[in-house]
Amino acid sequence: MKKILHLISQDKFSGAENVAVQIINNMDKENYESVYCAPIGDNKKQLENRNVRYLKLDKFDYFNVKKAVKKFKPDVIHAHDIKASIIASLFYKKSKIISHIHGNHENMRKFTLKTFLYNLTTKKYDKIIWVSDSAKDSYYFNKNIQGDKSIVLYNTISSEDILKKANEDKNDYKFDVIYLGRLAYPKDPLRLIEIINIMKQKYHNIKVAIVGDGQDRKIVEEKIRELGLEENIVLFGNMLNPYKVLKSSKVMILTSIYEGTPMCALEAIACNVPVVSTRVDGLIKIIKQGELGYLSNDNEELAEKIVYILENEKERKRLSKNIEKANKYINNMEKYIMTISEIYS
C-alpha cells in the first residue's frame, strides 16, 4: 500500500484544498493510504464533514513538516501550492515529490523570490501538475523545466457526490443567480456587486445568492448598501454544503481576475447550471461561448447575457441540454484518478 501525504501550507479551504480532498476521497483505499497535512483552522469543519483524515501542523515550516513526514513516512508527498512544494523538495531523498500548481497566479508570471525559489527546486520534483496550459506556459522559468516533468491536468469533480449532498439539504431555495467563492482578491467581488446592480436595472426583482466569505466581506456589504441592493442579495457566508443553493439557481456568475480551473464552475456543470464569467484562463476551454454559458470581460455584456438567460426559458433549456452532455466528459473523476495513480506509481 502506498502512503500519500497531501501537503498544503494554509488553513483555509478553497479550490486547491478541495482538489486535494477530492483526490483523497476517490483514490482506491485498498492501494492508497492518504492523509491531509496542513495547519488546521477554517478548514477543520470542511475536512471533518468530508471524513478526511488529517495531520495538524502547528505552523507551516520545515521543522513541523519534518515531524509529519517522520510520523507518516509517506511514499509520495503531493504538495498543493508553491510554498508547500518548496518545503516538500527538501524531503526528495525520502519520498517521491509531486508539485501541483492549481492556478495561473500573476506572481508566477514574473521574477519574484517565490518563482526563483521554485525554479531552484523543480529538479527535486518527480512530476509537476499544472491546472492549465497557460499556467504552465506563463511560469517565468518555464523553459528551465525538463519537458517530460510537466503534465497539464484540468480539475474535475464527482457529480454524483455533489448531487447527493444537494439532496441532503431539505431547505427550499429559489435564486436567479449564484456566486460561489471567496470574497477576496482575485475573485473581484466588488465587480460582482456592480454587475448585479446593472442587472437590477433590467431585471428588477433579481435574486442573487452569494455563498462564501473573505477579507473583502465588509466592503462588499458597504457596496450593497450604497447601491440599495439589500433586497436583491442574500449573503450566506461559508456553507459546508452549498449545493442545494447552487442547484436551485438559474445561472452561476464568476468575476475572477485569474483562475486555474475553478471548482465552482465544475460544480455548476454537475448541477446543470450555466456559467457566465469573465474570460479567465481555466474556463476558456470548458465554457465554449454559447454552449455551456458565456464569457466576457465587459460588465454590461455579462449582465446582458445573464438577463437574457433568465428571461428566456428556451435558452435555459438549450444550455441545460448541452451541459448535461458535457458533464460526462468534463467531470470524469474515474479518468482523473487514473492519471493521478499513474503519477504516483
Where are the language model's segments positioned?
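Conserved acidic donor-binding segment of nucleotide-sugar-dependent glycosyltransferases
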Residues: 289-300, 308-313
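A conserved mid-protein helix/loop that constitutes part of the nucleotide-sugar donor-binding site
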Residues: 14-22, 175, 179-201, 208-210, ...
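A charged, aromatic-enriched C-terminal amphipathic alpha-helix characteristic of glycosyltransferases
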Residues: 15, 314-344
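Short His-centered aromatic/hydrophobic patch
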Residues: 79-85, 101
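Short hydrophobic beta-strand element within catalytic cores of glycosyltransferases
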Residues: 274-277
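Acidic anion/phosphate-binding donor-loop and adjacent secondary structure
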Residues: 140-141, 149-174
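N-terminal strand-loop element at the rim of the active site
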Residues: 6-61
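Aromatic "clamp/platform" in nucleotide-sugar-dependent glycosyltransferases that forms part
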Residues: 238, 257
